[in-house]
């Protein structure tokens, strides 16, 4: 029983219990996004199973994004941004999985620290950017919505291994396809969602 203006008012306890607290709704939403990303990861791992088994592709899971990491040697010849036929086939398999998804997709290109200087690629910035763009164009041709796609080249600036050995340099030469969770309910719009995920990823890289 509640009181309003001095008069008792009956409150239905069942109705009160049926109203979810905002924090509960947010937890349910986040849990749903995590489940969605796990489902997407399973689909992609199934589509790329042979390349994953051979070590040419790695799928890295987090709650709010997936990273599909391609060894550059699978996709490109040294110093080139033209996709190899074998690499195209693998990317087409991934693209087929992306067509039916609403998630934003960013393709990132990375190189080792060996300098390049050519008419097409004055530096590793241009090479990494061109490689990422080549993958985006393939996805677009396969039917992935252009509005969901973006690409960026980081050159040699974000190594994941040492550049003093050939093995380390080979790991650094990579293309990463990042599939973002949809977090529009937690932040202001898609651009805010993508910015939040990027900040989380940068924090992970710095650890």
Predicted ranges, named:
Residues 75-90, 110-195:
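Periplasmic OmpA-like peptidoglycan-binding domain that tethers envelope proteins to the cell wall
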Residues 1-71, 185-206:
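Juxtamembrane linker/hinge segments adjacent to a transmembrane helix in small membrane proteins
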Residues 33-36, 40, 44, 87-90, ...:
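Stable alpha-helical elements in mature extracytoplasmic
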Residues 2, 6, 45, 49, ...:
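Sec-exported extracytoplasmic/periplasmic mature domains
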Residues 39, 43, 52-56, 61-65, ...:
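Extracytoplasmic
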């Amino acid at each position: 029983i509640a009181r309003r203006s001095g008069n008792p008012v009956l409150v239905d306890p069942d109705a009160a219990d049926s109203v979810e607290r905002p924090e509960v709704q947010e937890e349910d939403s986040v849990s749903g996004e995590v489940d969605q990303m796990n489902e997407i990861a399973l689909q992609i791992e199934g589509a790329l199973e042979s390349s994953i088994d051979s070590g040419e592709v790695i799928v890295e899971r987090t709650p709010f994004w997936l990273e599909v990491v391609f060894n550059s040697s699978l996709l490109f010849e040294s110093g080139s941004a033209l996709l190899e036929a074998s690499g195209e086939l693998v990317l087409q398999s991934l693209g087929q999985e992306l067509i039916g998804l609403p998630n934003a997709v960013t393709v990132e290109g990375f190189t080792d620290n060996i300098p390049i200087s050519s008419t097409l690629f004055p530096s590793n910035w241009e090479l990494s950017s061109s490689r990422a763009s080549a993958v985006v164009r393939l996805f677009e041709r396969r039917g992935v919505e252009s509005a969901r796609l973006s690409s960026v080249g980081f050159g040699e600036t974000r190594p994941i291994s040492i550049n003093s050995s050939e093995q380390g340099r080979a790991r650094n030469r990579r293309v990463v396809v990042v599939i973002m969770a949809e977090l529009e309910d937690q932040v202001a719009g898609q651009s805010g969602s993508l910015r939040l995920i990027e900040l989380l990823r940068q924090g992970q890289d710095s650890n």
